[in-house]
Structure formats: structure tokens, C-alpha cells
Amino acid sequence: MPEPVDPLHLLLIGAGPGVGAGVVRRFGREGFRSTLISRNETLEQLAPELRGEGLEIETVGADIEDLDGYRKTLERIFGAPGAPGVVVYNAALPDPDQILDTTVERLRTAHDVDVIGAVVAAQVAAPALRAAGGGTLLATSGGFADNPVPALASLSIGKAALRSAQTLIAAGVRDDGIHAATVTIAGAVKPGTDFDPNNIAELFWTAHTDSKDAWQTEYRFTGA
């Protein structure tokens, strides 16, 4: 039997100082506590900053490239009381590569991080969210899903596949009151521009708070 879900508990997978931190801050303003999953070196830098802003932050070190270990980490989180009612998958492997030069190993690793990690998160979270009567599963996508960039071959493939995966997940959980969607950022994220992380975070909040009759499987951010 899944443990009870806390609707004011956000799980951010792939925590970083840009969009991820913006989402944590936006949800934090609404009283959410956050659990951040990332590699330890990222958490060591980000978590103290967010706590210094008065946000309630827990951290869990995990490497999505180790899918078995990553799944076990998620199972521990969702097997404890107060499991997250909102999951945001924000992980990606953005290193440049060219499709005709990259290796099979590189393509597989990127696919694990860009796509499979989101699917695993949904697989683990869905039973708890179903038992709770609802929840939210969001994933960060990008304009590369629409317009592949030759110098970012693996990432372009991954973002397109992620959108397809989230659409399938959405179809599988909608009747359970769970909203699954991608948030597609159609531009370069940079503070102080139209693509400021805090502006983008507002769209994540909209996706989470939309009424069921307004649910979309993709929310697009094209600039403030």
C-alpha cells in the first residue's frame, strides 16, 4: 500500500541553479517543501542558497546514469510518509555531439538521462499519486524537440523522445486525476532576459494548478 502523499511536497529531479531553482522558489512561495535529487556536487552548491532564502529543502544524491540505483532512491522516497505530490523532471545531458560522430554508448547514456529517467520517475510515483487521488508529473523539454540542432544531436533526440513519453504517460494517468505534461522552453535560459528562470517557473506553476478541463500535455514558454 503506497504511503500517504503530501500535496505540498515537490520532488525536483535534476536540480540546478537555473530552471530547477526557479521552480523550487516558485512552489516554495506557495508553502511547498522540496526534495532535490541531483549529483552531490550540484546539491552542495544549490541547497544552502535555497535554505538561506527560507525554503525547506531536503537533498538526495543520485546519478540517473545508474538507473537501478536511481529507481531504488525513488522507491525509498515514495515508500515513506509524506511522499511528493508533485514531480518535476529537469534532468538532461546537454554535452555537444554530432549524430555521425557520436558513439552508441553516448547515445544510450543520453537517452537514459534525457528520457528513461522521466519514465522511471512516473512509474514509481504513479501508484502513490493514484492512491492519493491525484498529483502532477512535469518534465522540462526544449525547442530542440521541434528544431533539432546538429551540434546537440543526443539532446535534440532526447527532448523529442521525452515529449512523446510524457504524452503517453499523460494518457495513462489522466483518469486517475494525475496531470502529466512537458514544459517546453523555446529559447536559451538566461537570468535577466525574456527567458529568465523565474519567468519560466511561472509556467510550471500554471501547469500544476490548471483545472482538469484545461490540462494540456505540453505547455510552451516562448518568452516573457
How would you describe each model-predicted region?
Residues 50-68:
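Rossmann-fold cofactor-recognition segment
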Residues 88-96:
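Conserved NAD(P)H cofactor-binding loop of Rossmann-fold oxidoreductase domains
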Residues 16-17:
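Conserved glycine-rich cofactor-binding loop
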Residues 110, 130, 136-161, 167, ...:
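Catalytic loop of short-chain dehydrogenase/reductase
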Residues 100-119:
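Catalytic Tyr-X3-Lys loop
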Residues 164-167, 175-224:
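C-terminal helical subdomain
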Residues 79, 113-131:
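Amphipathic alpha-helical dimer-interface segment in Rossmann-like NAD(P)H-dependent oxidoreductases
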Residues 31-45:
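Conserved glycine-rich Rossmann-like NAD(P)H-binding loop of the short-chain dehydrogenase/reductase
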